[in-house]
Regions:
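Fe-S-dependent hydro-lyases/dehydratases of central metabolism
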Residues: 1-889
Length: 889
């Protein structure tokens, strides 16, 4: 941290904590000296205000920006652009590897300009947690964990060696090795400080812990009162190199919670309820801040579960204020007493402690006593289904999806059972959303214990797995003696990582796959994850339901989505009595008592004392020690990215977009999973052909996520999700389009190759909430490499819009209820963005011209979704990293 040299509001003060002196930028002093009323700001905006006070330099941050936070109070909204500098950056390996590759390529570009390549170095703390690569290859066996770790290192040795090179090559760059946990849970339990301490010119400074992360669920840490959200890897890389995050001061929605959850409900039920409420409200691009007397009834883990799913309810973050529960968690998770004292004193001094005297843009309220057991599905987190309605809801889903009157039934070869539409084939306790919450994990363990003791078993067609986000989870399950019962039901430990939640569910048995394909069975997964988009969990699963860990276990026993868990028996005991869910569901008191006896601070301290060592396989990996990476031309995992090749000294400026062909016309809620899938690679695809050329067998394909260090793979995989539906190619599903004027259906990548030969510009047409989901920068990088110049949609999700600009792609938004349907777009049109080459400004009205095949011409006004002046500079430079690099050389 290097504070700005200005101090317009005379806010730099000193505080004494435990007889130690610290400097800090006082919000109280700033209020006295010109920022009247700011004590009533939402706590999250106070964090932004402190950041501006600390970095005021009259260049990137000036007095007007600071004053604009005060002005926000007048209308509770603002169009002012501010420059925000988070304290640190959090990466995971799927996004971290391309980030390190970009930094390595930038070093080469600097060297080629005869400058010092070591100027490319992170200026803020960067932590990369390797959690996305482990797959559920083995499950339901005592040695599943060991086998999966071995396979993980066999597949990813080259990638991990590259990351080890990055750790020694770059400053301020730490790696948490594989097999440790999920980045957000490690962040919550270990990395976060709530209040950051840093030395500058001999003085120690205190300031709020803040971060951005290259994973959309970075928001989880807001449950610990650490302001953070997901950004694309390209924006994170720019932030590492000192570029502030350009943002508009957000609206803040106050979410009041009252009362407490009733007996028999979980934090998962609560968060799925919150997701539905806030999606209906509409909070995209806004902060949500929780307050109210109900906060005292939410544990820190409950808050983290709610904060985790901010991307699912559309908000930039879901922030919780500092209070006694925050301090309790810090102590409980092994933080030292002085750290806890700093947090308490600083929060109370700065007005960051929980209070009720807050002015919000708007408010919404939830009486938590009304929460009931809930699941969400079949394909969106906001598709809330009350557990009581689950069987009838699924029947309706099945009827709409298949038009079948009767179930497809398929015999599974070499077994004595059959599967049918609605059979649950995957049941996974997975994801940081829930495995960070001891109450629901203990709940699942107690339910398993009762089920086993009563003689219940999981159905044989269900693939079961347990993948916690932290090693502490297995410690307390073992101490409670519950791991034995989970193991007996097939929920053996398979790894510490994201696994099924991100699509790394591993293969289903061949005889199960054959049975699905033989009768086109509409198969189901149930997982304790945060996303259930189409095609995400497994290529063979059509419907995915999110549920609490105890319900995941219950559904694995039930085996079918049409089982009514309230009315239908799950099985019989030894005396032939029916057993129902209510007979095995643990009480809140049972959970609390077990938790008190099995979880303590020493577990956190011990597990994180040697967090950087990693397993023996990690320790054995060798890497070169150098500042410039030696690229292996034959590698199919890590290639030098092309984004900085032949970089001109001057910005590219505004480029003409004329007579562009639509490459895809897409509907609503197209996710970044649709645009750039993370999971399975199909043999019959352009990527499969590429692998065939490089003599790579299907068993060694790994996943798209693991190949993000290779642009050749990723550009072929862009828009290759098996469930994407391009309206230009009706009757197809997957990565296909129709090329014009021939009207020939081709794979997306093959069509791009053909259009490139012709010198044809390309655009993508979208519906509402284009780019929702993961903060996947490859969804923008791949779009760029395909030659797409603009994306024209009805609305954009926050992170993807930013990523498009960060790659030099123009986002345009339809206005006045105009859309692809009432424009009658089919893909045969030629589209021009008029006068863009003459220059545009943020939020300009931009006219597009549509030439129809009939000869008709229509002009349509759109909104330029370049929102800030900084974003405009990024666009003119062809991307944010190109902008940063030009400024450095």
């Amino acid at each position: 941290m290097t504070p700005g040299k200005k101090n317009s509001y005379n806010s730099l003060k000193t505080i004494l904590i435990d007889n130690k002196e610290y400097k800090y930028y006082s919000l109280k002093e700033a209020e006295k000296n010109g920022l009247e009323g700011t004590s009533n700001l939402p706590k999250s905006l106070k964090v932004l205000l402190e950041n501006l006070l600390r970095y005021e330099d009259d260049l990137s941050v000036n007095k007007n920006q600071i004053n604009s936070i005060k002005e926000w109070l007048k209308s509770k909204k603002s169009n002012t652009e501010i420059a925000y500098r988070p304290a640190r950056v959090l990466l995971q390996d799927y996004t971290g590897i391309p980030a390190v590759a970009d930094l390595a390529a930038m070093r080469e570009a600097v060297k080629d300009k005869n400058k010092d390549p070591n100027t490319i170095n992170p200026l803020s703390a960067v932590d990369l947690v390797i959690d996305h690569s482990v797959q559920v290859d083995q499950s339901a066996k005592s040695d599943s964990f060991e086998k999966n770790v071995d396979i993980e290192f066999e597949r990813n040795g080259e990638r991990y060696s590259f990351l080890k090179w990055g750790q020694q090559a770059f400053n301020n760059f730490r790696i948490v090795p594989p097999g440790t946990g999920i980045c957000h849970q490690v962040n919550l339990e270990y990395l976060s400080k709530v209040v950051w301490t840093e030395e500058f010119q001999g003085d120690k400074y205190l300031f709020p812990d803040t971060l951005v992360g290259t994973d959309s669920h970075t928001t989880m840490v807001n449950g610990l009162s650490v302001l953070g959200w997901g950004v694309g890897g390209i924006e994170a890389e720019a932030g590492m190199l000192g570029q502030p995050i350009s943002m508009l001061i957000p609206e803040v929605i106050g979410f009041e919670v009252t009362n407490k959850m009733p007996e028999g409900t979980t934090a998962t039920d609560l968060v799925l309820t919150v997701v539905k409420i806030l999606r209906d409200k509409g909070v995209v691009g806004k902060f949500v801040e929780f307050y109210g007397e109900g906060l005292k009834n939410l544990t820190l883990a409950d808050r983290a579960t709610i904060a985790n799913m901010a991307p699912e309810y559309g908000a930039t973050c879901g922030f919780f204020p500092i209070d006694d529960e925050t301090l309790k968690y810090l102590k409980f998770s092994g933080r030292d007493q002085h750290t806890v004292d700093i947090v308490e004193h600083y929060a109370k001094e700065q007005g960051l402690w929980a209070s009720e005297d807050i002015e919000f843009t708007d408010t919404i309220s939830l009486d938590m006593s009304t929460v009931v057991p809930t699941i969400s599905g079949p394909k969106r987190p906001q598709d809330k289904v009350l557990l009581t309605d689950a069987p009838t809801s699924f029947k309706k889903v099945l009827e709409e999806a298949t038009n079948k009157k009767d179930h497809s039934i398929s015999k599974v070869s070499n077994t004595d059972y059959e599967i049918k539409d609605g059979s649950i084939l995957i049941a996974a306790i997975t994801s940081c959303t829930n495995t960070s919450n001891p109450n629901v994990l203990i709940g699942a363990g107690l339910l398993a214990k009762k089920a086993v003791e009563l003689g219940l078993e999981v159905k044989p067609w269900v693939k079961t797995s347990l993948a916690p986000g932290s090693q502490v989870v297995t410690d307390y399950l073992e101490k409670a003696g519950l791991n034995t019962y989970l193991d007996k039901l097939g929920f053996n430990l398979v790894g510490y990582g994201c696994t099924t939640c991100i699509g790394n569910s591993g293969p289903l048995p061949e005889n199960i796959i054959d049975a699905i394909q033989k009768e086109n069975v509409y198969a189901v997964s149930v997982l304790s994850g945060n996303r259930n988009f189409e095609g995400r969990i497994s290529p063979h699963i059509k419907a995915n339901y999110l549920a609490s860990p105890p319900l995941v276990v219950a559904y694995a026993i039930a085996g079918h989505m049409e089982v009514d868990l309230y009315k239908d028996a799950l099985g019989k005991d030894k005396d032939d009595n029916d057993i129902y869910l209510k007979d095995i569901w643990p009480s809140n008191k049972e959970i609390e008592d077990t938790l008190k006896q099995s979880l303590n601070a020493e577990m956190f301290i011990e597990r994180y004392s040697n967090v950087s060592e990693g397993p023996s396989q990690w320790q054995k990996i060798q890497t070169e020690k150098s500042s410039i990476y030696s690229w292996d031309e034959g590698s199919t995992y890590v290639k030098k990215p092309p984004f900085f090749d032949n970089l001109s000294d001057e910005p590219e400026g505004f480029k003409e977009i004329k007579d562009a062909r639509p490459l895809l016309i897409l509907g609503d809620m197209v996710t970044t999973d649709h645009i750039s899938p993370a999971g399975n690679i199909q043999k019959e695809s352009p990527t499969g052909e590429y692998f065939m050329e490089h003599q790579i067998l299907p068993k060694d394909y790994n996943s798209y996520g693991s190949r993000r260090g290779n642009h050749e793979v990723m550009m072929r995989g862009t828009f290759a999700n098996i469930r994407i539906r391009n309206e230009m190619a009706p009757g197809t599903e997957g990565g296909f389009t129709k090329i014009y004027p021939e009207e020939k259906v081709l794979p997306i990548y093959n069509a791009v190759v053909e259009y490139k030969k012709r010198g044809t510009d390309l655009v993508v047409i979208g519906g509402k909430e284009y780019g929702t989901g993961s903060s996947r920068d490859w969804a923008a990088k791949g779009t760029k490499l395909l030659g797409i110049k603009a994306v024209i949609a009805e609305s954009f999700e926050r992170i993807h819009r930013s990523n498009l600009i960060g790659m030099g792609i123009l986002p345009l938004q339809f206005t006045n209820d105009v859309n692809r349907k009432n424009l009658n777009l089919i893909g045969s049109e030629l589209i021009s963005v008029l006068d863009v080459e003459k220059g545009i400004n943020p939020s300009d009205e931009v006219t597009i011209e549509i030439k129809y095949a009939s000869g008709d011409i229509k002009k349509v006004k759109t909104l330029c979704r370049i929102d800030t002046k900084n974003e405009l500079e990024y666009y003119k430079n062809g991307g944010i990293l190109q902008y940063v690099l030009r400024n450095m050389i």
